[in-house]
Amino acid sequence: MKTNFYFILLLLGVDLGYSQNTPTYYKDIAPIISENCMECHSYGGLGPFSLTNLEEVKSKIKTIIAVTKSGYMPPWQADPSFRSFENERFLDSTSIKRIENWYQTGMKKGKKKDLMNSNKLDRVKPKEDLTLFMNEAYVLSNKSEEDYRFFNIPTNLPEDTYIRSIEFIPGNKGVVHHSRIMVDTTNQIRGIDGLSEYDPKSLEYQKLPLADEFLYGWVPGNVPVLYPQGTGKKLFKNSDLILNIHYAPTSKSETDLSRIKLYFAKEKVDKEIKVLTIREGDIANQPFFIRANTKPTFYVSYSLKESINMVSIMPHMHFIGDSFKVLAVTPSGDAVPIIKIDKWDFNWQSTYLFKKPQYLPKDTIILITATYDNTISNPENPNIPPKDIAYGWDSTDEMMNFIIYYY
């Protein structure tokens, strides 16, 4: 009778390999990987391996389980319980457990029709209007240390131009660790091209004011900035882009020719994207100086001089940054959570995109709390034993910036 029962189940098309509650690749796992991993882990991407199909995911499943359970991947610093963002990459405990259950139940394939169309790589991507390359390829020759370089890239724009998006493309994903793009409208910083952060000449150039200190910041997986329709960021005629690249150590000669893609605003720009940078000079408990073997906290209380609609934000510190929190208090007393980073990681800085523009009225107070760890217990401390650290562009100096892109 038992044999006949199983025979009947097979005739009815029941899959005896798994139940309806058993996770499958197409229904449960592929959407998680697509939304949170494939931007880096794809062919030509920045991850060390691809996760674009079932076999690739199965081959790396133990690694995936380990790095997701530890919180190492996906790399996302902001606390989602404090504020959720459009471009967040975050796996909750349910998703992490689902991946592990899929492995434990035999990594069933499931039905392809169950696949949710969440793959960001399949979304229509417009063609760039202008691609700007470094003036010449930079050669790293057996450098066993971190390498921080400045490059000057003239835009040669014939007129003031509004851009709706900007994208950085590393020329050598094996050595380009992260980058930052700034704007100079004076054309007086062109001599910085190819100089190290530590070159005395570059220190002189750093004294000159910039039109934009943070046009865009890139780390692996950071999405291109896309401003809302009807808005645009103005790049002035003949302005230069200052590209700051961090190269990872290499054991052999490597070459990099990175590029920047600009996407012009096609429709009428009714609202210009502006940049507000709250910086070290706005700190209430001056001076901005971090003594060796201390963990100081700095505070900012910044009053908005106009009403704004925030499109995106970018906190910025260097290696001894430890935590960063921003809260806004409106004139009516409403508290608006902006961002909370409990454990800062210099290597995974991001531009955080709001799901919809966040309105803040004039006279709103932006409260910033930033803590630094200049002790030997900080594994990212560039100085062992610790040294006194002050403000500076160099990555071994420190900064405390909160950049707001708004209209």
Q: Model-predicted segments: where are they?
A:
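Bacterial Sec-dependent N-terminal signal peptides
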Residues: 1-23
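Aromatic- and Gly/Pro-enriched helix-to-coil junctions and flexible linker segments
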Residues: 20-151, 240-244
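Short acidic/polar inter-strand loop motif in beta-rich domains
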Residues: 106-110, 248-253, 371-380
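Solvent-exposed, flexible loop/coil segments flanking beta-strands in beta-rich domains
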Residues: 116-175, 253-320, 380-407
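Beta-strand-rich globular domains of non-transmembrane regions
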Residues: 206-266
